[in-house]
């Protein structure tokens, strides 16, 4: 059985804890929670960090997904809950496309991560992909070190990173930076990390994931 990178990281962290070795990075519970995109999303919702409209619980079947997709509104993006690297993702522009998109994404997720748990989000058309670098210590202090614009991608894989982003005004940069810090604190994150955000032309932005 293939393990997701998140599961592998949790196992290594737990081994260090058992052997009383100091691990540079967040503890195993944090890695486990953030490695599951659905759990991470719900954590941000509870903390008041803006997220894209989507499923509140994991989705396992086409039938479940079709009902939730109808409530969210099309277009829909289907994502692997334990995914990463652009794998296990498909877009359904209409209800007619949903079954094929879901099954294809789920099969890819099962092969890549050993887990077919999915979640759904409303698909944001032509957003910018912005990442904020954060540093957090074990005492609850968190700072961000500015942003990178990772919008130039191919098949959901980043090709060029630009810093600072020309799309951000000073006011928007401050607002997004504060949200990134809030997200890290909500997850009880420690060490260096990255908050990934989608930014619309309107200036609205949404938490996507943290790693």
Language-model segments: residues:
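A conserved helix-loop-beta module that forms one wall/lid of the active-site cleft
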Residues: 17-81, 88
């Amino acid at each position: 059985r293939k393990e997701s990178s998140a599961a592998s990281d949790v196992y290594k962290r737990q081994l260090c804890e058992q052997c009383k070795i100091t691990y540079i990075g967040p503890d195993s519970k944090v890695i486990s929670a953030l490695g599951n995109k659905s759990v991470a999303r719900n954590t941000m919702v509870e903390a008041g960090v803006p997220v894209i409209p989507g499923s509140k619980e994991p989705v396992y079947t086409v039938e479940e997904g079709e009902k939730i997709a109808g409530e969210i509104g099309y277009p829909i993006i289907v994502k692997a809950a334990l995914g990463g690297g652009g794998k296990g993702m498909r877009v359904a522009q209409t209800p007619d496309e949903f079954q094929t998109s879901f099954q294809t994404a789920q099969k890819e997720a099962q092969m890549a991560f050993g887990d077919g748990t999915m979640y759904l989000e409303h698909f944001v058309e032509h957003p910018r992909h912005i990442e904020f670098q954060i540093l957090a210590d074990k005492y609850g202090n968190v700072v961000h070190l500015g942003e990178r614009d990772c919008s130039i991608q191919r098949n959901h894989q980043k090709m060029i990173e630009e810093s600072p982003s020309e799309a951000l005004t000073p006011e928007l940069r401050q607002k997004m930076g504060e949200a990134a810090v809030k997200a890290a604190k909500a997850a009880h994150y420690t060490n260096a990390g990255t908050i990934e955000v989608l930014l619309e032309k309107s200036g609205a932005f949404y938490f996507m994931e943290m790693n």
